[in-house]
Amino acid sequence: MVETDQLYHIVHEAVERFAIMEFDGSRNEINHVKVREWLERNYPNKNQKIKQMNPLLLTDGYKTGHHQQYPKGTTLVYSNFTPRSNRYAPKGCDQVVSFGQQMVMQQLHETFERDFFSRPKSEVCGEMKRELSLYLSTDYDTSHFEALHDLGYLPIHVKALPEGSLVPIKVPVLTIYNTHPDFYWVTNYLETILSNLLWKPMTSATIAHQYRKVLTKWMEKTDAERAWFIDWQGHDFSMRGMDSAEAVISSGLAHLTSFSGTDGLPAIYGARKFYGETGFVGGSVNATEHSVMCAGTKDDEIETFRNLMNTYPTGILSIVSDTWDLWKVCTEHIVTLKEEILARDGKVVIRPDSGDPVDIICGKRWNDEQNPYDENVDAIEKGVIELLWDVFGGTINNQGFKVLDSHIGAIYGDSITIERADEICKRLAAKGFASTNVVLGIGSFTYQYNTRDTFGFAMKATYVEIQNQKLSGVSTEGREIFKDPITDDGTKKSATGLLRVETDTDGNYKLFDKVSWAFENSGSLQTIYCNGKFENTTTLTKIRESLKNILTPQLT
């Protein structure tokens, strides 16, 4: 038993708020018996630290009262999660990649199983009573939480569009409704956490797909015989700039729906845990960072290059090359090391890491006449790819574009955007180089500078059922509901009633609202979770294949 003196301030606040007992503020006049009784009821396991957050706290505070606010007799709430707008999305992202529903439902399921249903009811519901009583300044009734614990599972039916498909704006990617009439409140109680977990993987998967679309376009124009290279041309460098380890998994896994290159190891774990992958998921190469180059000293940089090649005599080796003077590396060091690089069984990749990525890779002509007094002007005008060609040469492919010798290459991974990726490929092509001569690192500048509003994701209820008591008996009324704020431009207008999504003659998803249960039960939305059980599971491999097939028409 915790001594009352230790909890004096907590109890004082509780007494003032709840008027649980008469108390005049004098420490010596506390009724210790009543205090101890109250503590036993409201502070179970006081000496234990909470190891995991109670999942019932994973919601907006205002939702904790909504079970009392629905019309009397409510038995069902039906909601959907939908991208409503691409107003703030990168150019070209006119549709959203359906991705992450299976992962999110597994996370939600495991959290409730471990941290709610598997814990004593008195403990988890006692936590909620304590927290919400303090939060709302009332004696909060947790009977609905207790009933959920007694039920032993999440009574919800979740449907989703196939992961790896493209979804038009305003078409729902997920629907959810409760399966037990007593738990109508559960549907939208879960809105907050579902939105929190779903928007990022879908946003990142959509952006990754757009990168692949751009890179595929230029590969087709300049180097179609090396289509395999696209899997590796977009490389995930975002981990250090993401806002959490969880975000690295959700966003990093989203990147892997379109590419195989990644430095985000947690994403590979995510592919195994949430999508059942057992073999190869993603990969990278041996690569240096600035600390390695600095440790070798500026004056001995060329020896650092040589030592690295000796350490890794085979395979791809990426060397960060602008710790001091990128242009010296590209015009002097690699000239000295040329024969060693060509004799090596593998590719040495030069990695610039600062400046304007388009100009660094493609070159920049900053005046009409070269300044004869600036030895770097010629290098800056040419850019890395042309400088590597000057030293190592290469081949001319069937489409007439230059492809660097297989022993040398380049990667740039700082401040890359979809627009810059497109411009790099465009300018390389204009100079006669294949777009496949460079790998682009995609970082948090791409994957972290987004919010739920990037695609306007929102979860809204569109249908409820109300049970009415009449003299003739009990009847159930289905109400088609919607929101359409008069002060909005139409973005926030929701669908109405039960929903069905199906493909049109062009293979595009189309939404039909105000349908019957019979029509809702079929269509493209597939059940993925119902009453604690998973259905229609998929794999990352299938998702990748689906997204690649979408781009196949470009390859004709």
What role is predicted for each listed range?
Residues M1-Y43:
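Protein-protein interaction and targeting regions used for scaffolding, dimerization, and localization
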Residues D60, P120-K121, D141, F183, ...:
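Helix N-terminus capping/helix-initiation residues
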Residues N45-R114, F259-S260, G264-L265, G270, ...:
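Gly/Ser/Thr/Ala-enriched C-terminal appendages of enzymes
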Residues W38, Q107, T111, E131-Y135, ...:
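Residues that form generic nucleotide/phosphate-binding pockets
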Residues E37-E40, I350, T539-L540:
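Secondary-structure transition/turn motif
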Residues N47-P90, L132, Y140, E146-P155, ...:
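Buried, small/hydrophobic-residue-enriched core segments of structured protein domains
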Residues G100-D139:
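Aromatic- and Gly/Pro-rich amphipathic surface segment
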